[in-house]
């Protein structure tokens, strides 16, 4: 794994055979060369699955906006790197090599000139803790007996630019409700701005591009999927699917049996 985010963590039982801790010092070209060197290893120690992450497009999209010249330049940079990778892998003469190119989210230019103010009542630190990721505002009500009254007050005072939810009644399809909160980190109330609106504290600045909106209502959030190699049909377009299904696809290609329940489906 070459800086695939989280793969070097010791949270799981097993780490990758070869891996690098995440940082952004390697250029795309350096990453390609490291991957090619892994593929040059003797067959008995050569990795069968390699993950590789490029942060350039995400960084430019956040800082300058997804439609900016800087974002376009970063896309060209990664596109050239992928082309270089494919060329070098082909030169190795390896058989049965497949490529899967994905993104973990989309991006949208936000309205940072007219941000939403955090409701005044939530600034009472004796009653509330708030966690603002700008495309989502999580509210922890310190007194559980006051959750319903706080929700009603927020609901009655909201504007058309955002929605207010009790976490336990958050839309199930978004996988961010009470049942999904294994470590009790979400809070009891969620304020969800409608794209491209964001919540922003007074006196703070923000970046031009964001993700984190509902992908069913904001198509800009949808991710990228390209795949090519001997197991994939050429010049074929497929319908959109949930990205959790990439995992069983990879397992199928590698001939691996998935022994635990997962969210994705191979079909």
Enumerate the language-model features and the residues they cover:
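Solvent-exposed loop/turn segments at secondary-structure junctions
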Residues: 4-9, 56-59, 105-108, 144-146, ...
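Acidic/histidine-rich catalytic neighborhood
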Residues: 96-97, 103-142
């Amino acid at each position: 794994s070459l800086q695939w985010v989280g793969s070097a963590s010791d949270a799981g039982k097993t780490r990758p055979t070869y891996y690098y801790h995440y940082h952004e010092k390697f250029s795309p070209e350096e990453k390609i060369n490291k991957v090619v060197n892994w593929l040059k290893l003797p067959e008995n120690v050569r990795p069968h699955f390699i993950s590789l992450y490029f942060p350039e497009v995400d960084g430019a999209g956040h800082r300058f906006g997804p439609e900016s010249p800087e974002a376009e330049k970063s896309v060209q940079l990664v596109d050239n790197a992928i082309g270089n990778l494919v060329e070098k892998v082909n030169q190795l003469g390896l058989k049965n090599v497949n490529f899967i190119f994905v993104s973990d989210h989309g991006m949208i230019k936000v309205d940072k000139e007219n941000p939403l103010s955090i409701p005044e009542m939530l600034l009472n630190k004796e009653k509330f803790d708030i966690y603002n990721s700008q495309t989502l505002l999580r509210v922890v009500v310190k007194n559980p007996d006051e959750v319903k009254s706080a929700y009603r007050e927020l609901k009655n005072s909201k504007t058309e630019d955002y929605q207010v939810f009790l976490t336990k009644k958050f839309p199930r399809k978004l996988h961010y409700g009470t049942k999904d909160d294994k470590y009790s980190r979400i809070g009891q109330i969620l304020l969800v701005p409608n794209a491209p609106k964001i919540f922003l504290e007074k006196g703070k600045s923000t970046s031009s591009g964001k993700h984190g909106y509902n992908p069913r209502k904001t198509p800009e959030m949808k991710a990228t999927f390209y795949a090519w190699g001997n197991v994939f049909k050429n010049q074929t377009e497929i319908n959109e699917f949930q990205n959790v299904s990439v995992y069983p696809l990879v397992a199928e290609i590698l001939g691996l049996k998935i022994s635990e329940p997962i969210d994705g489906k191979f079909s």
